[in-house]
Amino acid sequence: MTIFDNYEVWFVIGSQHLYGAETLRQVTQHAEHVVNALNTKAKLPCKLVLKPLGTSPDEITAICRDANYDDRCAGLVVWLHTFSPAKMWINGLSILNKPLLQFHTQFNAALPWDSIDMDFMNLNQTAHGGREFGFIGARMRQQHAVVTGHWQDKEAHTRIGAWMRQAVSKQDTRQLKVCRFGDNMREVAVTDGDKVAAQIKFGFSVNTWAVGDLVQVVNSIGDGDINALIDEYESSYTLTPATQIHGDKRQNVREAARIELGMKRFLEQGGFHAFTTTFEDLHGLKQLPGLAVQRLMQQGYGFAGEGDWKTAALLRIMKVMSTGLQGGTSFMEDYTYHFEKGNDLVLGSHMLEVCPSIAVEEKPILDVQHLGIGGKEDPARLIFNTQTGPAIVASLIDLGDRYRLLVNCIDTVKTPHSLPKLPVANALWKAQPDLPTASEAWILAGGAHHTVFSHALDLNDMRQFAEIHDIEIAVIDNDTRLPAFKDALRWNEVYYGLKR
């Protein structure tokens, strides 16, 4: 079972009584056929539920009102099978607070050249019914997604499925609770921000709990639970000699297991699905949570270090969006560069907390080594390299008057040399279009040093995320040129200033 099983998407057909009962009967029949086919063959993440035809303002408004109050409804897919006068949709769309996708399709793929008549034309009017619907969306300044293509086309299936992921993630975000253990790293700017504005814009709440509250739960974990989790570690990872049963760091592994069990219990009891820690506030914990955080991220929790609640929330959102897709998604940080003409590289990592979902190794190494930051005992961590291939890094920043999502398309590559003295998980990548352009654009746009790294999601997914939440997006990819990028930032400043 996945999070998508908790939701459904309503399929709404727009028409009108002008065409008579027989035409409406055929419209309903077509809709039933299309919905059944999409549910059985399109591999959509959510079930489509066909609703009664929308043929009058009252019917349409009732559907939209019901959608708002149904917690299982993640959004609406609308198909204008015939012409549906768009003034009928005004009241419904004005109150709708769920995501909306217009499926611009028709029942037949090919025109029946020899038999086409006006009855056929009146029945299959998506071509101009869809345009009428599009006008009212533009007139009401309500942005919605549009997918054009025949309902049997696999590309259309893929695009609808991607939108469904966004719709479900938006509903999950409205319920998301972010727990901050301690505060931000002192004097750091980008990890701070307006939590009230974030809750108004996205729906997630951010609150702080004392590390002492967590420590109480951690200290309540019994040896039996710790032993069971250690057995799981033994079967899932390659333990270094120091961490094996008679190793001199075995107790550190047991303490890491205690912290993991305590953190998970605390998060479950509080209904949290994202959290932050900071190495400056660890009072009562024997080590910085490393292994615990890595494993919790792999289970779907959002996380970021140093109190960075925006990145923690973004990671949870992207984890939901990517559920069931190939490739992983992780907290990440641009750590250091490799400058080589024509082969500039970025080495990404963090002190400990990189999610194993992006690991190339089937069984990462579990080790305990010294960590100079934090002043605690040596922490346990998983060490691995990252899968290669196309990926993205994304940063959500608070500009005071709005949020900006910054996305850099990257290509992860194999590490050309072993890293025998690097005791943390890492990812190595080439930034698009090149490191100088990408880094300068990122800096000019105010992108954070913390990011969410993903092989599972792509730029199109993040564009949809920005659209569905109505926030600015700045993209750095192979098409980026700095003069145009700077102009776009200036234009966005004017646009969003006027939009306020």
From Swiss-Prot:
MF GO annotations: L-arabinose isomerase activity; manganese ion binding
UniProt KW Transmembrane helix keyword: no
GO annotation terms (biological process): L-arabinose catabolic process to xylulose 5-phosphate
Gene3D superfamilies per UniProt: 3.40.50.10940
Class of enzymatic activity (EC top level): isomerase
Catalytic activities: beta-L-arabinopyranose = L-ribulose
Transmembrane segments: none
Cofactor: Mn(2+)
SUPFAM superfamilies reported for this sequence: FucI/AraA C-terminal domain-like, FucI/AraA N-terminal and middle domains
Note on how the cofactor is bound: Binds 1 Mn(2+) ion per subunit.
An annotated GO cellular component: cytosol
Pathway stated in the Swiss-Prot or TrEMBL entry: Carbohydrate degradation; L-arabinose degradation via L-ribulose; D-xylulose 5-phosphate from L-arabinose (bacterial route): step 1/3
Alphabetic keyword roster: Arabinose catabolism, Carbohydrate metabolism, Isomerase, Manganese, Metal-binding
EC number(s) stated in the UniProt entry for this protein: 5.3.1.4
Keyword Glycoprotein recorded: no
Binding site for Mn(2+): E306, E333, H350, H450
Assembly behavior: Homohexamer.
Family to which this protein belongs: Belongs to the arabinose isomerase family.
Known function: Catalyzes the conversion of L-arabinose to L-ribulose.
Protein name: L-arabinose isomerase
Organism: Salmonella agona (strain SL483)
Classification lineage: Bacteria, Pseudomonadati, Pseudomonadota, Gammaproteobacteria, Enterobacterales
